[in-house]
């Protein structure tokens, strides 16, 4: 079988009335796929998504059918697909990346320093970098093709984008995406905080099922789609340590002549962070 779509990290296969999403061990930084692979990274992404999908079915249905390769065609019953593959319902994906920020960091912090706003939302004066916001904010963006950058947009603009594709439904879908995104974030951030992890921000993607219902798709609250910070070292006023590919990003910035290859030590540290986040949140080892 050949994938019908190959992203920087995931491969998607058509399985008739379902899709099979395979999370590889590839790692991308600054929109480039690095030459190294991070062992077990794909399994962390898939199993962590499963964990959150199971936890949040009371808020919104999701696209997951199974992560058991025995439920999938023969082609996937091999070690390289075991643990990192998910059979999913087919959805008509909505053209909005649903970003929610509970803390002021990253591009949001840069925008706030310049203007006092983040994606059209005015924030209180005097916030420090990495400070918790009074309430989580919803900052949607448009989905870019591979190689392009997503564009942050206002909530009002998200209504326009959705209305263009779904005449008469733009406002309804935009409100549903906003409300679901914030409800998911609040529930999961509260759970994570009890397990020693701050979810600073994250992104969700939604689609429509065959009956036109909004369904959560893609991945959910992984170190690739979220900023996870260790709660025990959290201190506003500067950037925070994180459970993701920050080691890789920092090394690449400090070594511009790198030919997109990481030293083994940086690969190992990155793997350790992914596994640690999974262990803290789920209580399980991989």
Predicted regions and their residues:
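A long amphipathic alpha-helix within ATP-dependent nucleotide-binding catalytic cores
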Residues: 166-200
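Surface-exposed helix-capping loop/turn segments at secondary-structure junctions
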Residues: 57-63, 187-199, 212, 282-286
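Coil-to-beta-strand transition motifs
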Residues: 18, 93-95, 195-199, 211-214
